[in-house]
A protein has these predicted regions:
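An acidic, low-aromatic, low-complexity terminal/linker signal
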Residues: 1-169
Length: 169
């Protein structure tokens, strides 16, 4: 019972820290990740959590970018290789590879397989770019203080897109 209480305390503390990070001016407000050689940002309200890649059960007759399903704490999540979905190379499952669980508020039950997590990014360090959106899932584009290009993922548009929802061959 003590382990459950400790886990709950940890989750409450983490939730409070994330809320403070969102409300603080110039604080980290977007999760950075790397997929297909590109840097992506995800709004914290649209991300569930980032976890190491668990065992994934393949699904027959599925598109190449659909990895299969994973059991995460008793819940089944469909796993999409984000790089392959975008038309790039398949993501190698390494020690750095991660699954980004999409927020439960979308009721999508899905996770994106990405190359690695790049941590939280401060809004004050990102300069909006004038360039048009590269895909219908790109909300905005930014450049950081080091000149690196970032694309912000539009999660609601992604999880409602018919192409994303159709995993059968």
């Amino acid at each position: 019972m003590a382990a459950r209480l400790s886990l709950r305390d940890y989750q409450l503390g983490l939730s409070a820290r994330l809320q403070r990070a969102e409300t603080d001016r110039g604080a980290a407000s977007k999760l950075g990740l790397e997929a297909g050689g590109g840097a992506w940002l995800v709004d914290l309200t649209e991300a569930g959590e980032m976890i190491p890649v668990p065992p994934i059960s393949a699904v027959p007759l599925a598109r190449p970018w659909f990895c299969g399903v994973a059991n995460i704490r008793g819940n089944l999540y469909s796993v999409v290789d984000f790089s392959a979905f975008l038309g790039g190379e398949a993501t190698a499952v390494t020690d750095q590879a991660r699954l980004l669980l999409i927020s439960d508020r979308f009721r999508a039950g899905c996770a994106l397989l990405v190359d690695r997590s790049l941590g939280l990014r401060k809004s004050g360090e990102l300069e909006p770019r004038a360039a048009g959106a590269e895909s219908k899932w790109t909300r905005a584009e930014y450049t950081d203080t080091e000149g690196k290009r970032w694309r912000e993922l539009n999660v609601p548009a992604l999880v409602r897109d018919p192409e994303f929802l159709d995993v059968s061959v």
